[in-house]
Amino acid sequence: MAASSACLLGNGLSVYTTKQRFQKLGLDRTSKVTVVKASLDEKKHEGRRGFFKLLLGNAAAGVGLLASGNANADEQGQGVSSSRMSYSRFLEYLDKGRVEKVDLYENGTIAIVEAVSPELGNRIQRVRVQLPGLSQELLQKLRAKNIDFAAHNAQEDQGSPILNLIGNLAFPVILIGGLFLLSRRSSGGMGGPGGPGFPLQIGQSKAKFQMEPNTGVTFDDVAGVDEAKQDFMEVVEFLKKPERFTAVGARIPKGVLLVGPPGTGKTLLAKAIAGEAGVPFFSISGSEFVEMFVGVGASRVRDLFKKAKENAPCIVFVDEIDAVGRQRGTGIGGGNDEREQTLNQLLTEMDGFEGNTGVIVVAATNRADILDSALLRPGRFDRQVSVDVPDVKGRTDILKVHSGNKKFESGVSLEVIAMRTPGFSGADLANLLNEAAILAGRRGKTAISSKEIDDSIDRIVAGMEGTVMTDGKSKSLVAYHEVGHAICGTLTPGHDAVQKVTLIPRGQARGLTWFIPSDDPTLISKQQLFARIVGGLGGRAAEEVIFGESEVTTGAVSDLQQITGLAKQMVTTFGMSEIGPWSLMDSSEQSDVIMRMMARNSMSEKLANDIDTAVKTLSDKAYEIALSQIRNNREAMDKIVEILLEKETMSGDEFRAILSEFTEIPPENRVASSTSTSTPTPASV
């Protein structure tokens, strides 16, 4: 009897016949079906075969099953049908003598039974029976019926060694390949910034290169920093016409360091020089040099300057250089600190043995105090340009630049806005006009009015406007608190003038008193500083005098923080106390956390006690003056509070007019009515 075989991998069944004839398909010749052996032990099968071999086995099994389903059992036309049979039906067939042969697998738990099926016209049916176990009773019954039965061991398919090797390696190769593709995609290898050579390109510079920079910014767009702009215009002129300078022996500056607080236009100046110079321009952030891999930062510095030298003359702009140029030798990370290696390479490239002729490095930072001294020396950064907050003229010029695309009502004056915004940076002024435009659009206006400008200034300085308080003790307390600030400030010689008093909450403050700061905030006298302490304590003094010492509230917490810091500065920084003209800044005053940890406090215990005593003396003296002014002007305070509770906002002119009816304002604190349109500095509760 010829045979063909198929394998059922799922249930461990092997079907063996001798030959197949595809008569129903109209085929005249016989064909043999490839024999596929399968292990009946699933755990061993999964452990020995790989993913690729499993797919091949399943495909072959499917072909075998299709072939065997249409085959005849033998040449006499006796068919074989494959199916399952329950154990109870198997016992019934056994009792009736219909069982011809039994093959036992899996330690007697699976039986392949050849039985005569009446449903198939007494043809032999080959079925699979799940046995509860190989019992002695079943064996005795098989012997009694003289049935041919045999037990078989599980057969292992050793297969081809090459296929087994491929199967074993398929999953690890697919896993590693998938991880590699994911790393390339996340690092830019699939079209991102990393490039197709990742990770080989990890040491290459990430600087953005522009052969013909088109930043959309020129020197005409930069205002309020005339000194810095002049320095950059000289650099641009040197790049365009170097012969004018080399004829008299001048050399081009190797580096320009921009130093200033945030928002003053350092990056804007870099964009302007890129748009004006007409030479290749490289731009990169200091944080892009340092990675988690050792040596990457130094490698990127080398690659950056290599590209720059190939395109010289050119400009390299490093934004936030303090990320890589921090002072060395702090002991943090030791001598192998990655940042120090990167900085060492940067120092070498800027002014080392080889030099970098034709490459101008422009860097920006707002933390020049923590930069390494070797980085700041001439030859590396020949010029240090200070970009501070603009003065009145600078603010006016900046407002003209940012107001070009905005519509204003006829009563709006940019000069007045500039006067009202001392201490505002260029970014603050741009944000101010943008907020005013948003408010105008929200209110359905076609042009920006002074009302939107006022509200925008209040919003930027003090925060969002809150819900107005309802009448009651809390509102009355806030009113007395704010009027206390205003009265003590107005009656103390040297204090800033009151701009307005309001009970409209903004941010965390439930009420605000706005003052007009001095024209030059960089030069402040001892009298002015002490007057600010008195004015700051006026709110707490008003609460104590009006409501009693036991009714003072936490509303003065921010005032106390400000006046304590100001008094400490007068003693330790400005030398304005009985201790003498000493600068006594301790380690806690250091701006950098590492320097703060490394700094040694050389102050003696007695000197520290003297400082605390001097600070307390200043505060106590100021508080006594504030209490005296509140007690002596109780009638004026009650009148002003009554009007303020009704109107909720009072201008500085109106406040001074009412106060002058009850007491005399010091001559130096008297202001003209027009000044009330100047800038606010809030004192809040």
From Swiss-Prot:
The keyword Coiled coil does not apply. Residues 1-37, 38-73 form a transit peptide. Its EC number is 3.4.24.-. InterPro entries: AAA+_ATPase, AAA_lid_3, ATPase_AAA_core, ATPase_AAA_CS, FtsH, P-loop_NTPase, Pept_M41_FtsH_extracell, Peptidase_M41. Disruption phenotype: No visible changes in phenotype, probably due to a complementation by FTSH2. The presence of both FTSH1 or FTSH5 (subunit type A) and FTSH2 or FTSH8 (subunit type B) is essential for an active complex formation. GO terms for cellular component: chloroplast; chloroplast envelope; chloroplast thylakoid; chloroplast thylakoid membrane; extracellular region; thylakoid. Binds 1 zinc ion per subunit. Residues 38-161 are lumenal, thylakoid. The active site is at E482. It comes from the Eukaryota. SUPFAM superfamilies: FtsH protease domain-like (SSF140990), P-loop containing nucleoside triphosphate hydrolases (SSF52540). The keyword Nucleotide-binding applies. Heterohexamers with FTSH1, FTSH2 and FTSH5. May also form homooligomers. HAMAP family: FtsH. Part of a complex that function as an ATP-dependent zinc metallopeptidase. Involved in the thylakoid formation and in the removal of damaged D1 in the photosystem II, preventing cell death under high-intensity light conditions. This is ATP-dependent zinc metalloprotease FTSH 8, chloroplastic.
